Amino acid sequence: MELEYESKRPLYIPYAGPILLEFPLLNKGSAFTNDERSHFNLHGLLPEAVETIEEQAERAYRQYQDFKNDDDKHIYLRNIQDTNETLFYRLLEAHLSEMMPIIYTPTVGEACEHFSDIYRRARGLFISYPNREHIDDMLQNATKQNVKVIVVTDGERILGLGDQGIGGMGIPIGKLSLYTACGGISPAYTLPVVLDVGTNNPQRLNDPLYMGWRHPRISGDEYYAFVDEFIQAVKRRWPNVLLQFEDFAQNNATPLLNRYRDELCCFNDDIQGTAAVTLGSLIAASHAAGSQLRDQTVTFLGAGSAGCGIAEQIIAQMISEGLSEEQARARVFMVDRFGLLTDKLPNLLDFQSKLVQKSDALQSWNLTSDSISLQDVVRNAKPTVLIGVSGQPGLFTEELIREMHKHCARPIVMPLSNPTSRVEARPEDIINWTDGAALVATGSPFSPVSYKEKLYPIAQCNNSYIFPGIGLGVLASGAKRVTDGMLMAASRALAQCSPLAQNGEGALLPNIDDIQAVSKTIAMQVGKAAQLQGVAIVTSEEALAKAIEHNYWQPQYRTYKRTSF
């Protein structure tokens, strides 16, 4: 049954009695009116009082506050989501900045690690390799028929926690919660999926409660054939769906994106979403520092698919600001565990090969060894931007940051690794080491830093600023693909929303409580870019704006009327 939430007309429901209360998308709990209780055989199944959604949310928030640790709060919120989705999103809307770290990073990492321990109720689809011949049937079994957004993972690279097997399902569930809470995508249109291809994590394989396929991960041709079976089944079932790849290992993430990005409307949030939000933050930071991105010299710690995806977006923006491709690439330095990527380094991955520095250009560098370390790069290249996507804590040392600050009045430092325990440096330390001069953005949430009687807000360079707006823009415009131009438009729109860039003070990124307005701004620019690039039907700007509002779902109860199947 298709649930058209956008309309304010009554919703005709064929279910009644206890069955109706079991549908999270339909259940109102104590908010069913007396007429509805009569028509749907609910008298006696609910307490006497008829409540508003505001009263329900107040009770839920009081209960939420009674939990003392974040893991228990996460479990509580997920229980509400699995019972009454409208109430869940009304609660999130009222307390978004407080609850976002609970439903997503960093708390979702713990939920993924303990998925089989805290499992209560099925949500989404579990597509397992042993049942690969029945994928079409599994998609037909989905409780939601008109799916418009899918987030899919294979659980191999969950945040900075590695292989969690089907425990990775916590990520698609959390991401889609933010598509709704931040981007207004109706929960009736979203579907989380985990591809269960086994796990190489001995803790999971040896856990008697692990609920996934107890088998080492399949790989190579066998793996890619299975993913292709899933993609083709999705295309048959929902040909116009937006599919987001999430937390695939870097050796699979880029090949899958390259293979399917021209075949269906899809993107990889770890590569493209992370790149888009980081680029938007850098554009804003550059403006706040009185310069353009083309003027920056950028050093990365971490040269995986996420880091290289960010680097390519930065290079594209530098080129759009007037640099040649050669000039732009010469300003970006990639460092991994083997040192700086150069044209003499063997065994580079395909996506790394275009991001090497030419050895001839490094002849004048003062080096301490044959392997060019991060310290060597900072001392010789004199970067103005330092980005961490290594997943290794504490690698942005005091010595390193102070060396950077010697040649850069306002260094831009972005330790983006998740969760908090994996961050390359803590914002408080960066602010102290630079005497308050650094512009800091992190991947996980941090409290403002107090330094010399001044409060420094710390921007969370969170993909949640980007992907909900992309999703809303795709749905509103009817885009058939997600192009690089649409992602670039999202980055520039985010930069325009920066309080620091606009006013010269405040946070680098907007307040999380303003993220719904930010998502609509991004959706508008994404939709316009889709039209310009020929992947969406051209309409007027006014029509696109109306489509965005029409597609923006609000957590409000509708009136129900009874009908038969």
From Swiss-Prot:
One of its GO terms (biological process) is malate metabolic process. GO terms for molecular function: malate dehydrogenase (decarboxylating) (NAD+) activity; metal ion binding; NAD binding; oxaloacetate decarboxylase activity. Divalent metal cations. Prefers magnesium or manganese. The active site is at Y104 (proton donor), K175 (proton acceptor). The record marks D270 as: Important for activity. A divalent metal cation binds at E246, D247, D270. It is an enzyme of class 1 (oxidoreductase). Its EC number is 1.1.1.38. Its cofactor is Mg(2+); Mn(2+). NAD(+) binds at R157, D270, N418. SMART domains: malic (SM01274), Malic_M (SM00919). The keyword Transcription regulation does not apply. InterPro entries: Aminoacid_DH-like_N_sf, Malic_enzyme_CS, Malic_N_dom, Malic_N_dom_sf, Malic_NAD-bd, Malic_OxRdtase, NAD(P)-bd_dom_sf, NAD_malic_enz_proteobac. One of its GO terms (cellular component) is cytosol. Keywords: Metal-binding, NAD, Oxidoreductase. It catalyses: (S)-malate + NAD(+) = pyruvate + CO2 + NADH; oxaloacetate + H(+) = pyruvate + CO2. Homotetramer. Belongs to the malic enzymes family. This is NAD-dependent malic enzyme. It comes from Yersinia enterocolitica serotype O:8 / biotype 1B (strain NCTC 13174 / 8081). The lineage of its organism: Bacteria, Pseudomonadati, Pseudomonadota, Gammaproteobacteria, Enterobacterales. The gene is maeA.
